[in-house]
């Protein structure tokens, strides 16, 4: 049953991103369509990497838990770097990007928030890749969560600060 779910879930996610991209195209935003299609392919690739890691663990018991955590940390870091690349390209929308009430309030705030947030995600991604090499086991998992939560908090503060600056 697990293998069936692992096969169907990435297909469902791909279809979701495909239909979201097509809805953006109907709204007249071909730039957001392209960003969503690229993001969908990135998520698909990430899910396939998780499936490969799971299969390799099932096939070979030589892979220990620490190796799996390192691989997941590295993948998370790469996803953050990938997001950093895509964020500045997205126009204001309700699907993809740093979407807070402040960033959605104005196109100028949106663009500046995405640009500044991309640096936060790039640094967070690099930290996660470095942590995957340096740290082991449970401490690596704690650092994954800490970096992710800290990045989200910083990005939220950035969008508020940009909104406040442009409000004046």
Where are these predicted regions, by residue range?
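Alpha-helical transmembrane segments
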Residues: 1-11, 65-83, 146-147
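Cytosolic, membrane-interface loops and tails of multi-pass inner-membrane proteins
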Residues: 27-28, 91-113
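Membrane-helix exit/interface motif
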Residues: 16-28, 48-61, 131
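Extracellular/periplasmic helix-loop-helix junctions in multi-pass membrane proteins
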Residues: 130-145
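Hydrophobic, membrane-inserted alpha-helices
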Residues: 80, 123-131
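Select subsegments of transmembrane alpha-helices in polytopic membrane proteins
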Residues: 6, 14-18, 36-46, 111-123
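Membrane-water interface of transmembrane alpha-helices
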Residues: 11-25, 82-98, 159-165
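Long, highly hydrophobic alpha-helical transmembrane signal-anchor segments
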Residues: 33-72
């Amino acid at each position: 049953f697990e293998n069936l779910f692992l096969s169907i879930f990435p297909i469902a996610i791909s279809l979701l991103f495909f239909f979201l991209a097509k809805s953006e195209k109907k709204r007249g935003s071909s730039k957001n369509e392209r960003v969503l299609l690229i993001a969908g392919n990135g998520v698909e690739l990430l899910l396939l990497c998780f499936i490969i890691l799971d299969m390799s663990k099932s096939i070979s018991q030589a892979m220990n838990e620490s190796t799996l955590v390192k691989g997941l940390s590295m993948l998370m870091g790469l996803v953050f770097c990938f997001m950093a690349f895509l964020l500045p390209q997205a126009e204001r929308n309700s699907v993809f990007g740093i979407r807070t009430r402040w960033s959605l309030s104005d196109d100028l705030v949106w663009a500046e928030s995405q640009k500044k947030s991309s640096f936060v995600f790039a640094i967070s991604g690099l930290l996660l890749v470095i942590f995957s090499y340096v740290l082991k086991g449970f401490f690596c998992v704690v650092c994954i969560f800490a970096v992710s939560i800290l990045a989200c908090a910083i990005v939220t503060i950035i969008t508020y600060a940009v909104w406040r600056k442009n409000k004046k």
